[in-house]
From Swiss-Prot:
Record-given protein name: T-cell surface glycoprotein CD3 delta chain
Residue list for modification Phosphotyrosine: 149, 160
Gene: CD3D
UniProt cross-references to InterPro entries, sorted A to Z: CD3_esu/gsu/dsu, Ig-like_dom_sf, Ig-like_fold, Ig_4, Phos_immunorcpt_sig_ITAM
Top-level taxon of origin: Eukaryota
Stretches of the chain found on the membrane's Cytoplasmic side: 126-171
Extracellular-facing ranges: 22-104
Entry comment describing in which tissues the protein is expressed: CD3D is mostly present on T-lymphocytes with its TCR-CD3 partners. Present also in fetal NK-cells.
Lineage, uppermost ranks: Eukaryota, Metazoa, Chordata, Craniata, Vertebrata
SUPFAM superfamilies xref list: Immunoglobulin
Length: 171
């Protein structure tokens, strides 16, 4: 995970961008995270970790997202009130997939193949007629060329012609 090392280095560089007598170092060995200071390091809050020496603390496995607030005391030749606070926020992506060019090309090729197979399946099932229809069903004259509307079939409309007899019609 090159990105996680880069991200943790970037976080440390942001905190330690000014010149200071402190030397804070963050290490990743195998799957563990270590923070060391050139002076004594003290846990304040968050992941307590295991104190390996007065200057180095083991924060545990990086997959468990160690985070916390730590303090480096001043070197003996410096002012004893001078302290540096170090905030560690370690975040690992456990369900991520690295997307490089080969993976992306594989996804695109698989998508094209699946689309072609789907088109072939639709063509095979819908492209061929199962039976031949009669010639009369193929051509049907609905209206003659000179006719605008189709004539109504024979019907008894006597009941409808009596509905509005008493109403005045506007013509």
């Amino acid at each position: 995970m090159e990105h996680s090392r880069f991200l943790s280095g970037l976080i440390l560089a942001a905190f330690l961008s000014r010149v200071s007598p402190y030397e804070v170092e963050m290490e990743e060995l195998e799957d563990k995270v270590f923070v060391s200071c050139n002076t004594s390091i003290i846990w304040l809050q968050g992941t307590e970790g295991e104190l390996l020496s007065d200057k180095k603390i083991d924060l545990g496995k990086r997959i468990l997202d160690p985070r916390g607030l730590y303090k480096c005391n001043a070197p003996k030749e410096q002012d004893s009130n001078s302290k540096i606070f170090l905030q560690v926020y370690y975040r690992m992506c456990q369900n991520c997939v690295e997307l490089d060019s080969a993976t992306l090309a594989g996804i695109i090729v698989t998508d094209i193949i699946a689309t072609l197979l789907l088109a072939l399946g639709v063509y095979c099932f819908a492209g061929h007629e199962m039976g031949r229809f009669s010639r009369a069903a193929d051509t049907q004259d609905l209206l003659r060329n000179d006719q605008l509307y189709q004539p109504l079939r024979d019907r008894n409309d006597g009941q409808y012609s009596r509905l509005g007899e008493n109403w005045a019609r506007n013509k």
